[in-house]
Amino acid sequence: MADQLTYAFITPTALRKGRTGGILGRLISRSGLELNTGRVFAPSSKLLGDLAATFQSQPKTAAYLKALPADSQSLVLVLKGEDAAAKAASIVGDDASMGGRGETLRDTFGDLVESTQEGGQAVYFEPGIIAPANAAEAVAGLKLLAAASDAEGGILDASATFTESTEKTLVLIKPDNFAFPSTRPGGVIDLFARTGLALVGFKPFHMSVAQGEEFYGPVLDFLVEKLPDGRSQWESIIAFMAGKRPSECAAGEKNAPGSQPCVALIYQGPDAVAKIREALGSTNPANAAHGTIRKEFGTTIMINGAHASDSIENVARETGIIRLQENDFKTKIAAGI
């Protein structure tokens, strides 16, 4: 069976309350599907209504989407693989599978409180995550999301949800977390949730060798000065991030997307750079504090789980290098459906 695309919609409540990591980790590990792309959305009332119309088999979900306030920030994950829609739907659950003990993601991350009166009307319904029931619903929803992705998605702004001034910072979830479908990428996001920052940008990508050279260019002189094999060490960093050493590439190959998957995240809030760096931990996992990303997920100075920008200036430099503002969400969907 050929690969197909499906999607999962992480609701505004789940996104705001830091449930994204747990949802993502369980969805990827249980399904074995590839995280193809993703995007943060602030959907309009029209987009929410159009999406609701694709969930005819889930009336509670359809009503929930219609009732969401416009511009409520949410996260869409696009998954790829054999029989993707059916696999994701069985793991996410639906309107009828929210009363169990963790069999589905809705059991764990959603809530349904029904009246004890005859008829059992829903008093409170928060699904946490929504997924189409089949391939046809998936294609219909993906087309709507792709068409709206420029105007209603991207790197958003959550400053109105904070009482203090805010800043944005960049995180890269490194390739060591994607060796096989696992809970690791979600675990990294889960540990960052303790910062209380808003997740306002999300983009899976493959770093090219040329991007790696520019991204890690500032450390080359330091490594060459301090280590006899400094340039070789620098090339190893790029090979880890992009899949190939610069010296192994012809000039024309350097700009091609690399073989190693990464996910770029943008967090926003007061003192975002410092808070994320604290949650990240020391570059050397052996020296990192307990409960940090690098202590939990790192093994060496290079293979250490994640990268985070160390200054506002580097946030701008690094997001520019990896072209985070470019919208490949719609092109990946167009190529896959």
Predicted regions located by residue number:
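Non-catalytic terminal and connector segments of soluble metabolic enzymes
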Residues: 1-337
